[in-house]
Structure formats: structure tokens, C-alpha cells
Curated annotation (Swiss-Prot):
InterPro entries: ExoRNase_PH_dom1, ExoRNase_PH_dom2_sf, GPSI/PNP, KH_dom, KH_dom_type_1, KH_dom_type_1_sf, NA-bd_OB-fold, PNPase. Residues 669-738 form the S1 motif domain. The gene is pnp. Belongs to the polyribonucleotide nucleotidyltransferase family. This is Polyribonucleotide nucleotidyltransferase. It comes from Rhodococcus jostii (strain RHA1). Pfam families: KH_1, PNPase, RNase_PH, S1.
């Protein structure tokens, strides 16, 4: 990697670059520019990736703080502009509407490392808007957006302890290098040969250049869709040790990106403004609350049950606040915040000193586990997974592949055959609240569970269905997202989906502090909601018994030693193995498909026969659908998906399609029980086979007698037993009626029987 300092390219326009060297995979250049666009924003930076991908990030701040807020009002928005890809939006009004799922997930990737980088107690509204203006279809813009947002915030004159660098690294294998190489900013094409990829964000805590000490702040990682086939081909599996190596490999790249942002800020940053901060409480308030509550609260926090513990804690809180409130009139909010801070202190002390947790468990203990399938009667697949007081219902629905979600965003994905939706109703925590469209958190949790399961799903050739998985968080006390992974695995198997391997997930936590003069770290397995809130790290790991399929990490620390992180990963693997054993007791192989699930079969027809199967204006395919009740979807490569509520209907449709695409030509002398499909002045057309009609001339219809009108003898829809009298050189078939004759039966065919051949 090479280093460049920021330069002034035009009057008031500055830029800096970070060149990422991936060895044999080439270099990527990230360029930051400020001073040209969006000059009224507090900070505005354009970030380029190799000059073709271009994002504008603008950071703004309100002039006056929101003193009544008890949280930091930071908003991050990502605007995908379709002109970035040279497209007109597909919506009715032909303009961009609500943000896509990709945009929402990118907002979360930006928010998670930026939010803890602001000074504690800030109450001014901060808004970061990232606009995707140009995008090379081989690039993914999310990590570029993290860097752009950090750079614009860094120069905005805000109390911000950045910059934050974000990088995507992928373990890409080749025939020559099965162990693989960690490549930064991989292209979409390169990711096809990757076994694992992750977005890592962090910042420099000391040093500079390649020797800088980088603190990891956020990780979002996943195994790729084709990881199992790559492993079968000899590639390195993404085990816990390999994932830890990837995190270390990302640090020099992050240092390079942070350095480029620092260089830009040195030239173009505004001086930090005077922003008032509103600490949650003053020291005198905390001292009073601690003196009054410490003993009672410590006792309350030893109660194992969540509801009983919360009730007792609330009781202590009311009692203590009534006791100390007269001494702090008008500072009620401080009292509540101090009580929460004391709770956090006591919980952490117990873990660090006694190695025991709120509910009495040891640091590696998992709460009681329960797994059950076939919960919802008419669902195609369902399961209930419980871990302590966390309860998740997973429900699987199968349908035709044409029901896959159509994705209209800037990402490379245009359709989603597997959709995972996560719902978190307010009653899951015993509260009231808004229900309706999903919040960003629900979209993020659903995406995490979706990524965890994608590597083990069968291909569309192996299982020609669209799959919708819904996770209902019925009760929550810690890591409903990882509970969703477990419930989904069970429900998918119950629905008959042939997963390549079962997947389970577990949430880990970390608590650290100075104990007896040294920093002590304690990794916690299966964290509670309170441990998540009061801990230093939230670390979710999902995977099979052999490798990691998804990982999400958020930390409040300036850095986690590699040894501690490796230990937490190993702890997570042990917990995952325990959970997989419990799940296997409920179901370990795919069940028979539900009688309520559609039967979908994939067949192939010659590409040049697609038009005949569809027919003029869809006449033939509509006819097959009407006669059989089956749903039919035809792909451009000749793959035909046939779905029906029962097997015989699907088979009838398949037979009719095969009769058209691979017809058995009728011969002179063959007899059929056909259907009259059209009458004319000169005769009646009779359908013998799908797509194959013959003509009975009017002179042959009267049994030797002259008739005036064809309709006097037959009408459309009439069944007529006929024999092929002649087939001319153009393939036109002449028919004659035959009498009902049992002796002729062996040589006769019905239209349906012929189709079954």
C-alpha cells in the first residue's frame, strides 16, 4: 500500500487518496474530495472508488440542542439514485420512492460505528445523507458509504472522535491457492470465488501508517452462497480461526482509509464548534443513588427469573427515588439515569469478580433449550424454538419460483428466491407500541438470519421453489435474531426443504474492566437482554457444526485483543454444537412435504419449442392451465416450472407440455377420442393431442347422409371418436368419424391417454 497526502486540486477543493494493494488481485483506489459539491452542508465529501463509483456524503447539524431528549438524535439516510446505474426507476411514477432493503442495511452499517464516535451527552440533531451518484455494476457501494459518511462528519466541525474506516474483505480462493487470500474491496465477479466476506469498520487508536493500532468497532460477515461447493472442491472452510485471521487482515486497510481521511481533515476541516453536552447525571446524584440503592439492588439482581427480577428492580427503583428525590428537585431524569448506571455497575462487578451472571448462570452456560416442529396446522413448515425466555416461532411457505421477490435497487441482486422476514411485536417484551411496517432493526435482524441460512439452501435445480421464512419473536430476552436462525432451520426441515446442513446461532457478550490493577475480559455465552445493554460487546455467531455462516459484532471498546476474540469464537462454537444437538432431537432430516404445499416440478424443453408451448397470445399455455389447474412458468433457457396443489394435476400439465415440445406424431389409421374445438362451413376441427388438430369434412359427418350445417351434428366441446384417414405432405390431418365399436378399442386413444404417453 502506498500513501499520499491531501492536495489542493483547485481553489478551495481538496482531495486525498488511499491506494489498496491486493497483490495479484490488483489495486483499488479510494479518493476523497471536498469543497466542490454541497458547500452549504457542515461537511460534504465525495468518495470515489476507482473513479467510476461515486458517492456524496453530507453531514449537517442543528444549531440548538434538544435538551428534553435522553438520547443522541443521529439520523443516517442513504439515497440510491437510479441514474447511478443508468436506469429509470421501475415504479409507476418513475422516480425513487422508499429506500430499498440494501439502502436500509447500509444506513445501519454507517450508524453502528459512527454513533459511539460522537461525544457522550450530545443532543444536537445530526443528519448524514449519503447519495449514490454513480456505480460500477462490479462494485458494492456500502463500504464506500461508510468511509464517505465518516469523512464528511470528520470535517464538519463536530465533537467526533473519528475518522472511521470501513472495508469489505473476502477470502477468495483459486485453483492455485486453495487456502485463499483476503482481498479488500472485492468485485462482484471476485466474490463468486469467495468462501467468506465481511464488512469491518474501525478506527486508529494509536500510531500511524501501516503500524497503526486499529480498534475494530463493527463487523458484518457471511459465508457466500456457494461456500459448500467451494469447500467440496478443496477450498478453505471459514472456521473460527480463519474468521479471526480475516479481522486481523482488515486492520491495515482500515488504517490506510483512516489516514486518508485524517489528511483531508488536516487541510479542509472546520474548527470544532461549541456544542453543549448534557451528561446523563452529575456525580452527586450517582453518589446519593448508590448509597441508597446498592445493597437492595444487588439482592434484586440475583433473582433468576426475568419478570420477577424486573418487578423487584422496579420496586427498589421507586423506593429509592422517593427517598432521594426531595434532595434533587427538578433532576428526576438524572436520578433515573443514575439508577440505570448503578445497575450496570453491579451487573458487571458480579460477572468480573464472581464469574456469575444476573440469572445465576456461569459465564459459558446456556439457558434451557426447547425445540418443536409442526406447530401451525396448515403452514407448509413451522417450528418453535425456545432459549430461556426468548421464544421464536418460525414459519415456512413454499411457492412457485416466479413468486421470488423482484429487487429494484442498485445492487447486483435482481431477484430473491429466499426471503426471510423478522417480526418483533411490542408484546414480546411485555410492552405496548406501534405495529405495522417493519422498522430498520427488524429489517436488519431478518437480513442477518437470512445470510446465516443462505449457504445451506438447496439450489433451484435441486428444489424448484421460492421460499418465504417468517420469524415471529413471541418473547424476547436476548438474541432473538440468533433464535430466528434456529427456528428457521427447524421450520425449513419440517417443510421438506433439503438443507445441506443444519444451522444454529448464539449471541456472545464481553465484559471488561480494571480488576486488581489489570484489564480483565470475560466472554459470556448466550447473553440476556440486560447483558447486551450493559456489556462491552454484542457478538452474534451462526453456523453449521463445521464452519461459520454469519457473524455480527458491535463493540464499545477501543480494541479487543486477538486472543480474547479467538476465545469468544471458540466459546460460540461449543455453544452452537450444544444447540444443534437439541435441534436434532426435534428434527434432523427433511420431513415429507405438507399436503398443503404446492408440488413444483422442473422440466426442460428445447428453446425453439418455447413459442409452441406458449402458443399465439398465450393460448396454449392458458389452455393447459385451465384444463389441469396447474401454474406454469417458463424461463428463457427452456426450464419450465410446473406447480399444482396435487401431484396428478402437475403430471397432467407436464404430459401436455411434453406432447407439444416432444410430440409423438400421429399415424394414419390411429383412432382418438377427440374434442371439437372449432366448427366451420366445411367441417369440424378436432383436437387429437395438445397442439395437434385434424379436420373432419362436412361430407363425412352425416354417416353417408348429406347435412346442411356442421352444427346439426356436432358443436364445440363435443367428444367425437375419429380415425386418421390421411396426413398430407404439409402435416395436415384428415379425419373420419368412426362408430362406437368395442372391437376397435385396443387401437383407439383418447386425447388424455395420448397425452400421458
Amino acid at each position: 500500500m502506498t500513501e499520499n497526502s491531501a492536495v489542493e486540486v483547485d481553489e478551495g477543493v481538496f482531495e486525498s487518496t488511499a491506494v489498496i494493494d491486493n497483490g495479484s488481485f490488483g489495486t483499488r483506489t479510494i479518493r476523497f474530495e471536498t469543497g466542490r459539491l454541497a458547500q452549504q452542508a457542515a461537511g460534504a465529501v465525495v468518495a470515489y472508488l476507482d473513479d467510476e463509483t461515486m458517492l456524496l456524503s453530507a453531514t449537517s447539524a442543528s444549531k440548538h440542542p434538544k435538551e428534553h431528549f435522553d438520547f443522541f438524535p443521529l439520523t443516517v439516510d442513504v439515497e440510491e439514485r437510479m441514474y447511478a446505474a443508468g436506469r429509470i426507476p421501475g415504479s409507476f411514477f418513475r422516480r425513487e420512492g422508499r429506500p430499498s432493503t440494501d439502502a436500509i442495511l447500509t444506513c445501519r452499517l454507517i450508524d453502528r460505528p459512527l454513533r459511539p464516535s460522537f461525544v457522550d451527552g450530545l443532543r444536537n440533531e445530526i443528519q448524514v445523507v449519503v447519495t449514490v451518484m454513480s456505480l460500477n455494476p462490479q462494485d458494492l457501494y456500502d463500504v464506500v458509504a461508510i468511509n464517505a459518511a465518516s469523512a464528511s462528519t470528520q470535517i464538519a466541525g463536530l465533537p467526533f472522535s473519528g475518522p472511521v474506516g470501513g472495508v469489505r474483505v473476502a477470502l477468495i480462493t483459486s485453483d492455485e491457492n486453495k487456502a485463499g487470500q483476503w482481498v479488500a474491496f472485492p468485485t462482484v465477479e471476485q466474490l463468486e470465488n469467495a468462501v467468506f466476506d465481511m464488512v469491518v469498520a474501525g478506527r486508529i487508536v494509536s500510531g500511524s501508517g501501516d503500524d497503526a493500532d486499529v480498534a475494530i468497532m463493527m463487523v458484518e460477515a457471511e459465508a457466500t452462497d456457494n461456500v459448500i461447493s467451494l469447500i467440496d472442491g478443496g477450498a478453505q472452510a471459514p472456521t473460527e480461526a480463519i474468521v479471526a485471521e480475516g479481522l486481523e487482515a482488515a486492520k491495515p486497510f482500515i488504517a490506510r482509509l483512516c489516514t486518508a481521511q485524517q489528511q483531508l481533515a488536516a487541510k479542509a476541516s472546520k474548527p470544532t464548534g461549541d456544542f453543549p453536552v448534557f451528561p446523563a447525571y452529575q456525580d452527586d446524584v450517582f453518589a446519593a443513588v448508590e448509597a441508597a440503592a446498592a445493597e437492595k439492588l444487588s439482592a434484586a439482581l440475583t433473582i433468576a427469573g426475568k419478570q420477577e427480577r424486573d418487578d423487584k428492580t422496579d420496586e427498589v427503583k421507586v423506593e429509592v427515588l422517593e427517598q432521594v428525590a426531595p434532595n434533587f428537585e427538578g433532576r428526576e431524569k438524572e436520578l433515573g439515569a443514575a439508577f440505570r448506571s448503578l445497575t450496570k455497575k453491579l451487573v458487571r462487578q458480579r460477572i468480573l469478580r464472581d464469574q456469575f451472571r444476573i440469572d445465576g448462570r456461569g459465564i459459558t452456560d446456556i439457558r434451557s433449550l426447547s425445540a418443536e416442529v409442526a406447530i401451525v396446522p396448515r403452514a407448509h413448515g413451522s417450528a418453535l424454538f425456545e432459549r430461556g425466555e426468548t421464544q421464536i416461532l418460525g414459519v415456512t411457505t413454499l411457492d412457485m419460483v416466479k413468486m421470488a421477490q423482484q429487487v429494484d435497487s442498485l445492487g447486483p441482486e435482481t431477484t430473491k428466491r429466499y426471503m426471510h422476514h423478522y417480526n418483533f411485536p411490542p408484546y414480546s417484551t411485555g410492552e405496548t407500541g406501534r405495529v405495522g411496517s417493519p422498522k430498520r432493526r427488524e429489517i436488519g435482524h431478518g437480513a442477518l438470519a437470512e445470510r446465516a441460512l443462505m449457504p445451506v439452501l438447496p439450489s433451484v435445480e435441486e428444489f424448484p421453489y421460492a421460499i418465504r421464512q417468517v420469524s415471529e419473536a413471541l418473547s424476547s430476552n436476548g438474541s432473538t435474531s440468533m433464535g430466528s436462525v434456529c427456528a428457521s432451520t427447524l421450520a425449513l426441515l419440517n417443510a421438506g426443504v433439503p438443507l445441506k446442513a443444519p444451522v444454529a446461532g448464539i449471541a456472545m457478550g464481553l465484559v471488561s474492566d480494571q480488576v486488581d490493577g489489570e484489564t480483565r475480559y470475560v466472554a459470556l455465552t448466550d447473553i440476556l437482554g440486560a447483558e447486551d445493554a450493559f456489556g462491552d460487546m454484542d457478538f452474534k455467531v451462526a453456523g453449521t457444526k463445521d464452519f461459520v455462516t454469519a457473524l455480527q459484532l458491535d463493540t464499545k471498546l477501543d480494541g479487543i485483543p486477538s486472543k480474547v476474540l479467538a476465545g469468544a469464537l471458540s466459546q460460540a462454537k461449543d455453544a452452537r454444537a450444544t444447540i444443534l444437538e437439541v435441534m436434532a432431537e426435534a428434527i434432523d432430516t427433511p420431513d415429507e412435504m405438507s399436503p398443503f404445499a404446492p408440488r413444483v416440478t422442473a422440466i426442460k424443453v428445447p428453446v425453439d419449442k418455447i413459442g409452441e408451448v406458449i402458443g399465439p397470445k398465450g393460448k396454449m399455455i392458458n389452455s393447459i392451465t385451465e384444463q389441469t389447474g396447474a401454474n406454469i412458468s417458463i424461463e428463457d433457457d427452456g426450464t419450465v416450472f410446473v406447480g399444482a396443489t396435487d401431484g396428478p394435476s402437475a403430471q397432467a400439465a407436464i404430459d401436455m407440455i411434453n406432447a407439444i415440445a416432444n410430440p409423438q406424431l400421429p399415424k394414419v389409421g390411429e383412432r382418438f377420442l377427440g374434442t371439437v374445438v372449432k366448427t366451420t362451413a366445411f367441417g369440424a376441427f378436432v383436437s387429437l393431442l395438445p397442439g395437434r388438430d385434424g379436420l373432419v369434412h362436412i361430407s363425412k359427418l352425416g354417416s353417408g347422409k348429406r347435412i346442411a350445417k356442421v352444427e346439426d351434428v356436432v358443436s364445440v366441446g363435443s367428444k367425437l371418436r375419429v380415425e386418421i384417414a390421411d396426413i398430407d405432405n404439409r402435416g395436415k390431418i384428415s379425419l373420419i368419424p368412426v362408430e362406437e365399436d368395442g372391437a376397435a378399442a385396443p387401437a383407439e386413444q383418447s386425447e388424455e391417454a395420448a397425452a400421458e404417453k
